């Protein structure tokens, strides 16, 4: 329902702006006197429009309609958000506690958190490999030696606390 309302509003706004743009060029004022105007080899009679005739953009009813449609669209959008935040069973009863925020975590936030956790783990692995490579270079061992995926020296691994500069590493 809301999608249909939004598309109707958008379509009506586009049509009204297109008509205003097309017909505004026809209303441009010319310096010719009203009355008979030469057109080809013939004379045509120009209609005398009153001085205060309004174009499409000057029509106050059109702007009122557009403002009302925008208000209605925003009102429906606000109702949809309120329904998502407060379940219908809890609306009338104020004695119950609101739903817990942990239950309302959206899948996109959960995905973002998981992605950041994976990136953090990859950063720890990368820094550990760099540190192991530095140690092997400092001890003048063979520089062509491959750094294993799971290092044998577990005490040489970097923790996330060392990366972020926190001294308390457990």
From Swiss-Prot:
Major subcellular location class: nucleus
Recorded superkingdom: Eukaryota
Keyword Transmembrane helix on entry: yes
Signal peptide: 1-20
Keyword Acetylation: no
Transmembrane segments: 56-76
Name this polypeptide is given: Protein FAM209
Native organism taxonomy: Eukaryota, Metazoa, Chordata, Craniata, Vertebrata
């Amino acid at each position: 329902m809301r999608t249909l309302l939004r598309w109707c509003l958008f379509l009506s706004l586009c049509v009204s702006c297109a008509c205003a743009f097309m017909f505004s060029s026809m209303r441009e004022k010319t310096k010719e006197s009203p009355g008979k105007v030469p057109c080809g080899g013939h004379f045509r009679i120009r209609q005398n429009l009153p001085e205060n005739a309004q174009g499409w953009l000057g029509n106050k009813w059109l702007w009122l309609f557009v403002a009302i449609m925008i208000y209605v669209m925003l009102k429906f959008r606000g109702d949809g958000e309120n329904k998502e935040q407060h379940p219908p069973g809890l609306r009338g009863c104020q004695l119950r506690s609101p739903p817990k925020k942990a239950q309302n975590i959206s899948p996109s936030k959960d995905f973002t958190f998981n992605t950041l956790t994976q990136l953090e783990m990859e950063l720890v692995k990368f820094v550990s490999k760099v540190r192991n490579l530095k140690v092997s270079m400092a001890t003048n061992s063979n520089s062509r030696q491959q750094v294993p995926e799971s290092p044998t020296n577990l005490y040489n691994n970097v923790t996330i606390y060392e990366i972020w500069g926190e001294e308390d590493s457990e």
